[in-house]
């Protein structure tokens, strides 16, 4: 006689074992119809699963995040159902969920075309609209293997042989004649899987191992209703328009080429944005009492062995040799900062020491993972390391948190997600050290009133970390900032200070980055602003243009006044119609167009319009110089008149 406790604390008693769906039916027909699955004592279970003992139960519907994830997983099975009907000889591999959707890896004897994808999507919809029930059956390991052997599914057999114990009872999900194997849970009926779209096909190695066969990976997205799907597809369209690679080319910001994969060639305008970001961060370094340093580009392998990087990070490090010595090009700045700390005796009175660097780092990322500015091999980190005592940890982490939010708000990012990443399987240091480090970061977050999500096993090999993810205008998350606590590296590199009792102690090291990779951050803000950079970041802040040749000298005089005020302004005195010039510079996203005609010369003024087409009227040159200077000084996000 199980007693089921619901989230509101109410209880229901049943005479016999009861399924999740039956509990929902006892509450109401509306809830039963909406039931996708349940959470029994915190564990996700299928709607058909029986509950035989007292338990806490939450009903999962399409309104829940878990419900949407289950819909996506079941839509992957729907894809399997459809493709098996269209291509009976296809071999099915794996079909997990991913952010906003799912994929299925398949082994087919020919490449899928866009026409195939369209046909496949149509068949999926036809099947889903029959609203068939999904039947779950627990079977023995051998029965599952026999099932997939009879269906000639070698990848499913491999999963059973390599990943599932022989005394286990795998779950087989029956989608009419199609059978798939999965942990589940899945939707009880395909009426939940009507809103999806297949997105693309890519190559993927079985098990992610390049020694294995290349499979075809079909990506799709699935949502709970028609509006969610339409909104998502609209966001994708908008993201395509905002693609930093397209905008970077259109605005002549940078380029990349095959001879230097993952390395950026910054053009003048892109480098202007880069330097403005550095200048801004430097003002904050001064405000938060950091010293700026510069470490060497590469160091001897021996040092990287002492730090643990060689044992834990070698695959991502570029190396070179000279005079029978092996060097590694630095993938991060921390070992160099410890070397600077070690020069000269340090006292507890000197701590904390906050050491910052715009460090040029290189990581040998797989070529297939490179993506514009978002994933590169050569990048610049706005990196800092704080050497402090254990008693100073919380106050220093709190200061870092304040600095993170201070900087992000300047760019208009206020929706920030905080995650605490804990010890990974591959790590250095004792568990007691990790306990202290993880607790120290958790305490700082709690004392600052920040909600956070724990990411088990996602920390760096030398310490746990706080991650800050920005949510942009398209509802995407970008992980940028990190604060990492490190009790190990200073000791490995013999960093010490003289404590109050005259004993030599090892300092705690806090790693922190806010923008992260400056290259990547430029990619993020390029897409956030769609290339319409605020005045302080815009490579060209205003263009002064004439109407006829008679105003050319006046234009040059005006440009000189703006330039002398430290503003980035250029002249356009080409023999072109003023409307043509305005259109051209509008496409270049220049914030302000300053037009000079005969009337403006007489009045010693300029006519001002914005890149959005707003006519701001006329201003004296001195007046508008001050307006632009103020916009730059305050780092305002909007233009005048917006």
Curated annotation (Swiss-Prot):
Organism: Histophilus somni (strain 129Pt) (Haemophilus somnus)
Chief location: cytoplasm
Protein known as: Threonine--tRNA ligase
Signal peptide annotation: none
Gene from which the chain derives: thrS
Self-association and partners: Homodimer.
Entry-linked InterPro entries: aa-tRNA-synt_IIb, aa-tRNA-synth_II, aa-tRNA-synth_II/BPL/LPL, Anticodon-bd, Anticodon-bd_dom_sf, Beta-grasp_dom_sf, TGS, TGS-like
CC per GO annotation: cytosol
Cofactor: Zn(2+)
